[in-house]
């Protein structure tokens, strides 16, 4: 896939600093270090658009990336095992909840799971919240390239036990990029 015109717009720690141009938004949600930023980079064809790190918790604000002047890909802070003070973690939680509940321009979310780890309680809480609020989402299973075929199948089967069909993704091979774009495009066309 060729690179899209994608640009970093703002890193927001407060709702009043979110973009105000009313473009539709696609949110990327998941635990710390699950591959949200890598997925955004793969989707846009820009290896360094979203900052990636092996250290959990590097994304500490909501980052907005405008794509082709038509919509935003939104990288949210991860939840889970990031080594940050409790106060920061609570601020992230409040910020994320506010964004998910009140952001009118949020049209679709990618709930990202590490195929090796599957569902954890906070992932299930988020899934239940999205279901309860009628927020459309796609479950993306990342890091498939770190598993052999039988391990991948076992991980995907475990994710399916929650009644969803995960879309496998690999940042290394690009597996799943086309299918994720199809889901995003379908959502944006329906708006």
Swiss-Prot record:
* The organism's place on the tree of life at top rank: Bacteria
* BP terms from Gene Ontology: division septum assembly
The cofactor(s) it depends on are: Mg(2+)
Sorted alphabetically, which keywords does the UniProt record give?
Cell cycle, Cell division, GTP-binding, Magnesium, Metal-binding, Nucleotide-binding, Septation
Q: Where is the EngB-type G domain?
A: 22-190
Q: Which residues form a coiled coil?
A: none
The answer, when asked if Metal-binding is one of the entry's keywords, is: yes
Question: Which positions bind Mg(2+)?
Answer: 37, 59
Would the keyword Cell division turn up in this protein's UniProt record?
Answer: yes
The UniProt record gives the binding positions of GTP as 30-37, 57-61, 75-78, 142-145, 169-171
* SUPFAM superfamilies (UniProt xref): P-loop containing nucleoside triphosphate hydrolases
CDD domains per record? YihA_EngB
One Gene Ontology MF term: metal ion binding
Quote the function comment for this protein.
Answer: Necessary for normal cell division and for the maintenance of normal septation.
* Protein family per UniProt: Belongs to the TRAFAC class TrmE-Era-EngA-EngB-Septin-like GTPase superfamily. EngB GTPase family.
Protein name in UniProt? Probable GTP-binding protein EngB
> Which source organism does the UniProt entry give?
Solibacter usitatus (strain Ellin6076)
């Amino acid at each position: 896939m060729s690179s899209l015109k994608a640009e970093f717009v703002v890193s927001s720690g407060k709702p009043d600093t979110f973009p105000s141009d009313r473009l539709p938004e696609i949110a990327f949600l998941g635990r710390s270090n699950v591959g949200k930023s890598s997925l955004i980079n793969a989707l846009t064809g820009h290896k360094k658009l979203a900052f990636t790190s092996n250290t959990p918790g590097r994304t500490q604000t909501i980052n907005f990336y405008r794509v082709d002047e038509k919509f935003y890909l939104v990288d949210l802070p991860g939840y889970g095992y990031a080594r940050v003070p409790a106060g920061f973690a609570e601020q992230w939680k409040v910020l994320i909840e506010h964004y998910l509940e009140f952001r009118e321009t949020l049209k679709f979310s990618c709930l990202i799971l590490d195929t090796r780890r599957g569902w954890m309680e906070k992932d299930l809480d988020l899934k239940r919240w999205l279901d309860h609020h009628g927020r459309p989402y796609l479950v993306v299973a990342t890091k498939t390239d770190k598993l052999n075929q039988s391990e991948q199948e076992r991980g995907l089967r475990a994710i399916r036990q929650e009644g969803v069909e995960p879309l496998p993704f690999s940042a290394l091979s690009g597996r799943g990029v086309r299918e994720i774009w199809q889901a995003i495009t379908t959502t944006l066309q329906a708006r």
